[in-house]
Curated annotation (Swiss-Prot):
Protein name per UniProt: Zinc metalloproteinase/disintegrin
CDD domains for the chain: ZnMc_adamalysin_II_like (cd04269)
PTM remark: Not N-glycosylated.
GO MF term (any one): metalloendopeptidase activity
Active site: 334
InterPro entries: Disintegrin_CS, Disintegrin_dom, Disintegrin_dom_sf, MetalloPept_cat_dom_sf, Peptidase_M12B, Peptidase_M12B_N, Reprolysin_adamalysin
Gene Ontology CC terms: extracellular region; plasma membrane
EC number: 3.4.24.53
Feature type site, description Not glycosylated: 293
Intrachain disulfide bonds: 308-387, 349-371, 351-354, 414-429, 416-424, 423-446, 437-443, 442-467, 455-474
UniProt catalytic activity: Cleavage of 3-Asn-|-Gln-4, 10-His-|-Leu-11 and 14-Ala-|-Leu-15 in the insulin B chain, and the bond Z-Gly-Pro-|-Leu-Gly-Pro in a small molecule substrate of microbial collagenase
Residues reported in the UniProt entry to bind Zn(2+): 333, 337, 343
Length: 478
């Protein structure tokens, strides 16, 4: 039997329309101050770990209460995850820190089928969530009241400079005829069910970035972990699991000659990866995080279709923003090039601001366009990259079912947690006899609402969202 433990903090919200604040993510216009309320479901008699496998938080956004359901990203680190830095005399110092009880989560908003979330819960809640089609960021406020957080839209983060930020890859659509043709193909839903693939990622931090963060290894580690958690979430729709295998920080000096021309630095980094890094530890792909200013406002570069090649399975990314999410999007973009994805063409790809846009947009870029999916499918078919087929060593990337965590896991039909729920049997996580559903905007008294019942009122010019009569979810109408 499951007992639900409610840990109530304090729920409040204070909007600050038109005001500005300096946060870790940068200067922010228009934000709300919220005090999240934590709701935790634990088995009776269970010892609460420092960071639970599943958590729930309630707070308000634009005056409306939302419930954020989080589940620990157990596939974030490989089983043999390692960290390397260097002594003053150049010796490698490698450790294998315990990462079992880490603080990085993925999740969703209750009753919003299209929602996603990528959150660090290390010191308060920090990350992003998608709610009703809008991307919001959340992070703790440095106030005497430690529970205060700021919630704000992505586009309300002020630009750190006005110069456009570009990917340095300049190959065009005509550069590969097979890929060009792939962009014109129609993929059936069956074809778009991508096979499960795994990328064991190595991240290398250059000396300039190490110095930028005051030679604070812990601060860099935290930033990188947040970044990879975000990248992992963005690749989930493609059925790609990104696992951090190693973090190598050039704490004493750069181990290659850093150049302002991005492709030159990428070539040197690829040579170093092939001759040095791969001999230290096996991995599938390496990214170099740097503080160098590349020519042409370039913030990233990667080899096209280089995944699994010893020299070319690399990318380089400038740490161009204090906002971790923005740098994570750039790294996601460069990994996409290594997976065969070209830049989105504005005339051929129907996506206003997708991940593979050549220029960073003011609007959130956390989705792959249909063109990108076609490119990736073609890369899998033509190049058959072998290194990303095998799963990492970790065997517990699928969590043990935890009743009451609001995630439908293996073997569960419903997930309520409370024995008093009339629709769901908390002991078995199965629907009770006669019940069609237990939760959702189109579920009422354990039954699906009638077809055409309004489940979400229109916003702007969009039509009302209506139930299908066959599901508890409220689908978004176009």
């Amino acid at each position: 039997m499951i007992e639900v433990l409610l840990v109530t903090i304090c729920l409040a919200v204070f909007p600050y329309p038109g005001s500005s604040i300096i946060l870790e993510s940068g200067n922010v216009d228009d934000y709300e101050v919220v005090y999240p309320q934590k709701l935790t479901a634990l088995p009776k008699g269970a010892v609460q770990p420092k960071y639970e496998d599943a958590m729930q938080y309630e707070f308000k956004v634009n005056g409306e209460p939302v419930v954020l359901h989080l589940e620990k990203n157990k596939g974030l680190f490989s089983e043999d995850y390692s960290e390397t830095h260097y002594s003053p005399d150049g010796r490698e110092i490698t450790t294998y820190p315990s990462v079992e009880d880490h603080c990085y989560y993925h999740g969703r908003i209750q009753n919003d089928a299209d929602s996603t979330a990528s959150i660090s819960a290390c010191d308060g809640l920090k990350g992003y969530f998608k709610l009703q089609g809008e991307t919001y960021l959340i992070e703790p406020l440095e106030l005497s009241d430690s529970e205060a957080h700021a919630v704000f839209k992505y586009e309300n983060v002020e630009k750190e400079d006005e110069a456009p930020k570009m990917c340095g890859v300049t190959q065009n659509w005509e550069s590969d005829e097979s890929i060009k043709k792939a962009s014109q193909l129609y993929l059936t839903p069956e074809q778009q069910r991508f096979p499960q693939r795994y990328i064991e990622l190595a991240i290398v931090v250059d000396h300039g970035m190490y110095t930028k963060y005051s030679s604070n290894f812990k601060k860099i580690r935290k930033r990188v972990h947040q970044m990879v958690n975000n990248i992992n979430e963005m690749y989930r729709p493609l059925n790609i699991a990104i696992t951090l295998s190693l973090l190598d920080v050039w704490s004493e000096k750069d181990l290659i000659t850093m150049q302002a021309v991005a492709p030159t630095t990428a070539r040197l980094f690829g040579d170093w990866r092939e001759t040095v890094l791969l001999k230290q530890k096996d991995h599938d792909h390496a990214q170099l995080l740097t503080d160098i200013n590349f020519t042409g406002n370039t913030i990233g570069w990667a080899y096209m279709g280089g995944m699994c090649n010893a020299k070319n399975s690399v990318g380089i990314v400038k740490d161009h923003s204090s906002n971790v999410f923005m740098v994570a999007v750039t790294m996601t973009h460069e990994i996409g090039h290594n997976l065969g994805m070209e830049h989105d063409d504005k005339d051929k790809c129907k996506c206003e601001a997708c991940i593979m846009s050549a220029v960073i947009s003011d609007k959130p870029s956390k989705l792959f366009s249909d063109c990108s999916k076609d490119y990736y499918q073609t890369f899998l078919t033509n190049s058959k990259p072998q290194c990303i087929i095998n799963a990492p060593l970790r065997t517990d990337t699928v969590s043990t079912p935890v009743s009451g965590n609001e995630f439908l896991e293996a073997g569960e039909e419903c997930d309520c947690g409370s024995p008093s729920n009339p629709c769901c049997d908390a002991a078995t996580c199965k629907l009770r006899p006669g019940a069609q559903c237990a939760d959702g905007l189109c579920c009422d008294q354990c039954r699906f609402k009638k077809k055409r019942t309004i489940c979400r009122r229109a916003r702007g010019d969009n039509p009302d969202d209506r139930c299908t009569g066959q599901s508890a979810d409220c689908p978004r109408n176009s």
